[in-house]
Amino acid sequence: MSGVKDKMLVGERFRRALCSYPESAVVQEAMARELVSMVRLHAGEERLGRVLEIGAGSGLLTELLLEAFPVASLTANDLVGECREPLREIARRLRIAEFSFLKGDIEECGELPGSQDLVVSNATLQWLNDLDKLFAAVRRSLVPGKLFAFTSFTVGNMEEIAMLGGGGLSYRTTEEIGEIAGRHFELLELKESREQLTFSSPREVLGHIRQTGVNGLGGERWSRSRYLDFMENYSRLFRVQGGVSLTYRPLYCVLRRREL
């Protein structure tokens, strides 16, 4: 089973990064844009009455989705309660008639709001422990024939950090996610990509990770010697033109609830 045990630590890291996330999360923003394009491809231009977003965070996907589709009602979920007001403001500005916020770990929220026309999630599901259980809950929440569209990360994500023992998730493979999804949905599209960012130094890499909250693992403090070893080895092993690399492995998936 993949995922993470200490959700409180994950929430605290994202809470600290809430203000810096929109500017720093360049890969996650690109993922959100691609996901909206995929939803448009499979859903067309139909009006979406009720939408549920899992792990809405600062609202990167929220805003792009609400700008692209007419939506009557939005339920936004996040582990971090402080996300409520920024998300409410996005909904107000884009004239969404109904907005509600579902605070907490989506795996502990019980039955999800029903009669949804779309369920979406961007860069969140890698933190969850039981995708099979979540997918079953999402299927029950959707109107038959409607879509569940999400992004996550797959094996090899932030491989530089993992190789140096800097902490990281045990990511599911794309094949594993497809197999779990197929138990509950019709699989419309599943793909992955590789995105490499370049930073001037390993120190900048760590700053980027901190500003996006994705260092939600590993609560221990590093000693000075471990920190210096990390910097030296990162510079030596992951040097590219213009600096050092950090590699993301995004995954994109669109599913449809089968008709009754």
Swiss-Prot record:
InterPro entries, A to Z: BioC (IPR011814), Methyltransf_11 (IPR013216), SAM-dependent_MTases_sf (IPR029063)
Catalytic activity, reaction form: malonyl-[ACP] + S-adenosyl-L-methionine = malonyl-[ACP] methyl ester + S-adenosyl-L-homocysteine
CDD domains listed in its UniProt record: AdoMet_MTases
Pfam families: Methyltransf_11
Pathway entry: Cofactor biosynthesis; biotin biosynthesis
Keywords: Biotin biosynthesis, Methyltransferase, S-adenosyl-L-methionine, Transferase
Class of enzymatic activity (EC top level): transferase
One Gene Ontology term from the biological process aspect of the record: methylation
Molecular function per GO: carboxyl-O-methyltransferase activity; malonyl-CoA methyltransferase activity; S-adenosylmethionine-dependent methyltransferase activity
EC number(s) per entry: 2.1.1.197
Family: Belongs to the methyltransferase superfamily.
Function text: Converts the free carboxyl group of a malonyl-thioester to its methyl ester by transfer of a methyl group from S-adenosyl-L-methionine (SAM). It allows to synthesize pimeloyl-ACP via the fatty acid synthetic pathway.
Cross-referenced PANTHER family: TRANS-ACONITATE 2-METHYLTRANSFERASE, TRANS-ACONITATE 2-METHYLTRANSFERASE-RELATED
Name of protein: Malonyl-[acyl-carrier protein] O-methyltransferase
